[in-house]
Amino acid sequence: GFLTAEEKSLVNDLWSKVNVDEVGGEALGRLLVVYPWTQRFFQSFGDLSSADAIMGNGKVKAHGKKVLNSFSDGLKHIDDLKGTFAKLSELHCDKLHVDPENFKLLGNVLVCVLAHHFGNEFTPPVQAAYQKVVAGVANALAHKYH
């Protein structure tokens, strides 16, 4: 696999403390605020007119929760990310035509949110392991483009 045993345990130890529902909504919300061009994929989500509107939007929270539950699932199959995300890759790439660059942006936002939530616990080695994971997931999601 692309993660060492040590990195896997760092990732899993922190993940066991993550409130997936809350962090998912915050990560997706921040993506839409920080990178406003990503909003075009979410036009059916209602009010995205301001940071407050986005962060309080129920549909954004619900989709963020779905996104992070999938990510959680990916962590359980860390050595087969391509297989785990094949269906979602097809949906996002073929049907929704999401630019794969956006998966990288969301991964980086997720890392920021984790750093924000966990503070000192989010040590440089933990961050390094998570950067590898989000890059791996983004890569797996972009797989259908190649």
Curated annotation (Swiss-Prot):
Residue list for modification S-nitrosocysteine: C93
CDD domains named in the record: Hb-beta-like (cd08925)
N6-acetyllysine modifications at: K59, K82, K144
Domain Globin: 2-146
InterPro entries for this protein: Globin, Globin-like_sf, Globin/Proto, Hemoglobin_b, Hemoglobin_oxygen_transport
Phosphoserine modification, residue list: S44
Amino acids binding heme b: H63, H92
GO cellular component: blood microparticle; haptoglobin-hemoglobin complex; hemoglobin complex
Biological process according to GO: hydrogen peroxide catabolic process
Superkingdom as given in the UniProt entry: Eukaryota
Keywords, ordered alphabetically: Acetylation, Heme, Iron, Metal-binding, Oxygen transport, Phosphoprotein, S-nitrosylation, Transport
Tissue expression pattern: Red blood cells.
MF terms in GO: haptoglobin binding; heme binding; hemoglobin alpha binding; metal ion binding; organic acid binding; oxygen binding; oxygen carrier activity; peroxidase activity
Family: Belongs to the globin family.
Role description: Involved in oxygen transport from the lung to the various peripheral tissues.
Subunit structure, as described in the record: Heterotetramer of two alpha chains and two beta chains.
The protein's name in its UniProt record: Hemoglobin subunit beta
Gene behind this protein: HBB
